[in-house]
Amino acid sequence: MLTYDRWETVEKPSFPSDNETKGALDVLAWAYREYGDEIVYACSFGIEGIVLIDLISQVKPDAEIVFLDTGLHFQETYDTIAKVKETYPSLRIIMKQPHLTLEEQAAQFGDELWKRDPNKCCELRKVIPLREVLTGVTAWISGLRREQSPTRRHVEYVNKDDKFRSIKVCPLIHWTWKDVWNYVYKHSLPYNVLHDRGYPSIGCAPCTAPALDPNDLRSGRWAGQGKTECGLHLT
């Protein structure tokens, strides 16, 4: 089995990228054969997440999907999760919450920490909870695409994740924004209505705005903060 500690000694898999799903289904089939229940999908329920959930359901209908429930998400995001649960009732969707409630965080670090120190807020409400989830598994799945931002252009299908000492599987690396939406429309998948309101990338409500640059899908995240990632993905 390919693990973080055996990264240098185990042969890495290769996948075709010229088929209908640009390798995504092949990658997922390999991942669930390789890891079984030792792999989870950390999903934000953005549009890439919806595509991945549909693909995963074809490979492992009872897969474990983890949502980092920071307590700061848009209501539209929670509505999307409810629709996904109705569409894929066999999936095991886990709402992973941080140790601190928003009130406890405010008491300890001050009100609206996301405005003063967004990195600390992301660490408390996303990074630490994900680390706890990944402690019990060998690998995780992510919806990263190379087209999403300059910081993601070199992502591979299978990656050594030094931050979480895990294997990170990214089936959608070759998908374009157009590919994603074509798949959603073709299969009539439920999705977050905020995408129709100018939000190509959706995170916590206080730190997400409509895209500022049409050529940078993540330009609406942490606008004015000099920040482009929540800390889950090394750049």
UniProtKB/Swiss-Prot annotation:
Main location: cytoplasm
Superkingdom field: Bacteria
Catalytic activity annotation: [thioredoxin]-disulfide + sulfite + AMP + 2 H(+) = adenosine 5'-phosphosulfate + [thioredoxin]-dithiol
A UniProt-annotated Pfam family: PAPS_reduct
GO biological process, one term: hydrogen sulfide biosynthetic process
GO cellular component, one term: cytoplasm
Note on how the cofactor is bound: Binds 1 [4Fe-4S] cluster per subunit.
EC category name: oxidoreductase
Cofactor dependency: [4Fe-4S] cluster
InterPro entries named among the record's database cross-references: APS_reductase, PAPS/APS_Rdtase, PAPS_reduct_dom, Rossmann-like_a/b/a_fold
HAMAP family, sorted: CysH
Protein name per its UniProtKB record: Adenosine 5'-phosphosulfate reductase
Organism this protein belongs to: Geobacillus thermodenitrificans (strain NG80-2)
